[in-house]
């Protein structure tokens, strides 16, 4: 029998947001969405630093509370920086999120993702198609976008089973696959999250922002599963509010509204009533 997601993570939903501290999140990411990610962190009262030079790692790791590694724009130098940061994070017990952007598109990203997984990060995320490829299932994704064909009930169940298999080798890692229904899998269980609106797929960086939000919550000491569930639900609810307030506007206005809600919605006592999801 399924359980309502807010019952399972009641304490986290009640206390995680608004933040009571300002975790410093080190982001090694892509140039396309770096500004959106930095501002999203600031909007929830976290602090971003976008430092990807290995020479600075010892000093920045000593200051930061969490690490986000995003594969959105790969070069030979950035690949080496991502690998070095992953190892540094493991050695210093830094909470880490790996965002597998484009892993379904190229073998290089697939291999890099698995190299980073070997460091036992806290969270590994991607869209449904990316996570299917990562789990060695057939994926119909193109570029960095997920495919509707990968989001059927059968495909989602197949992915959940494959990710559960991965948790046997990586029991301290939580896996997130985002889509129309978001799938969260860890050694502790499987959860479906059901908030969001289609417009969130229509502007770039939404998945990157979710990764940053997860890292921020990990930086406050929240456990992996709770950080993922709360961050995904919160961002999707921000999108729902923005869509409701922007019925006649365009996508640019919707984007602005969603980002605005990051700094507003947590102060609304009834936002938890919006959350939809279940534990399987």
Curated annotation (Swiss-Prot):
Single GO MF descriptor: ATP binding
Any Gene Ontology biological process: thiamine biosynthetic process
InterPro entries documented for this protein: Hyethyz_kinase (IPR000417), Ribokinase-like (IPR029056)
Pathway(s) it belongs to: Cofactor biosynthesis; thiamine diphosphate biosynthesis; 4-methyl-5-(2-phosphoethyl)-thiazole from 5-(2-hydroxyethyl)-4-methylthiazole: step 1/1
Reaction(s) catalysed by this chain's protein: 5-(2-hydroxyethyl)-4-methylthiazole + ATP = 4-methyl-5-(2-phosphooxyethyl)-thiazole + ADP + H(+)
Keywords, alphabetical: ATP-binding, Kinase, Magnesium, Metal-binding, Nucleotide-binding, Thiamine biosynthesis, Transferase
Cofactor: Mg(2+)
E.C. designation(s): 2.7.1.50
CDD domains: THZ_kinase
Annotated ATP binding sites: 125, 178
Enzyme class: transferase
Chain positions recorded as substrate binding sites: 50, 205
Cross-referenced HAMAP family: Thz_kinase (MF_00228)
Family statement drawn from the similarity comment of this UniProt entry: Belongs to the Thz kinase family.
Function, in words: Catalyzes the phosphorylation of the hydroxyl group of 4-methyl-5-beta-hydroxyethylthiazole (THZ).
Name used for this protein in its record: Hydroxyethylthiazole kinase
Organism in which the protein naturally occurs: Lacticaseibacillus casei (strain BL23)
Upper classification of the organism: Bacteria, Bacillati, Bacillota, Bacilli, Lactobacillales
Gene this protein is translated from: thiM
